[in-house]
UniProtKB/Swiss-Prot annotation:
It comes from the Bacteria. Keywords: Hydrolase. This is RNA pyrophosphohydrolase. HAMAP family: Nudix_RppH. PROSITE patterns: NUDIX (PS51462), NUDIX_BOX (PS00893). The keyword Hydrolase applies. Pfam families: NUDIX (PF00293). The gene is rppH. Accelerates the degradation of transcripts by removing pyrophosphate from the 5'-end of triphosphorylated RNA, leading to a more labile monophosphorylated state that can stimulate subsequent ribonuclease cleavage. Coiled coil: none annotated. Residues 6-149 form the Nudix hydrolase domain.
Length: 182
């Protein structure tokens, strides 16, 4: 389902723990990390799609989280042509997303990357909210930054601090701290 401009409606999920660290999932058989996200099906509201995607990708149910906020409008990114399926070229531009900020009220052990038979991630970890976005595929970085900046107002942070810390090495300790489903 594409809109008139060629964007697929989608939801993005920033899941925080009690320390305001964010959930990052490692794409299966890739070394790229991302927030959970997915398409909005015909007839679904963004919130319904968010809860469906949260379960499909992270295995969490509505009772495991609390919605803290969402973006006011759609955030868009274009997908480079070489990433677009041949049959979609010419009509598909990219994704437009409503982003949700969630607080995990359950336990880390509630995360189940194999809740469905088509897992999206093979590992996950908590990261600092302002971790550099170098490990995110390049064409999504600006939308991630926009979502993080817009939604931070719902968290208790020192608002005078930098938006993105450049000095921190992204995912440098991933081998030691990846939590994967065995």
């Amino acid at each position: 389902m594409l809109d008139r401009e060629g964007y697929r409606p989608n939801v993005g999920i920033i899941l925080c723990n009690g320390r305001n660290e964010v959930f990052w999932g490692k794409r299966i058989r890739e070394h790229s990390w991302q927030f959970p996200q997915g398409g909005i099906k015909r007839g679904e509201t963004p919130e319904e799609a968010m809860f469906r995607e949260l379960y499909e990708e992270v295995g969490l149910l509505p009772e495991h989280v609390r919605i803290l906020g969402r973006t006011k409008g759609w955030l868009r990114y274009e997908v480079p042509t070489h990433w677009i399926k041949r049959e979609w070229r010419g009509s598909y531009k990219g994704q437009k997303q409503i982003w949700f900020l969630l607080r995990l009220v359950g336990r880390d052990s509630d995360v189940n990357l194999r809740a469905t038979n088509k897992p999206e991630f093979d590992a996950w970890r908590w990261n600092d909210y302002w971790v550099p976005l170098d490990a995110v595929i390049e064409f999504k970085r600006l939308v991630y930054e926009q979502a993080l900046n817009e939604l931070v107002r719902f968290l208790d942070f020192d608002r005078k601090g930098p938006r993105h810390k450049k000095e921190q090495e992204p995912f440098s300790d991933v081998v030691d701290s990846v939590r994967s489903e065995e």
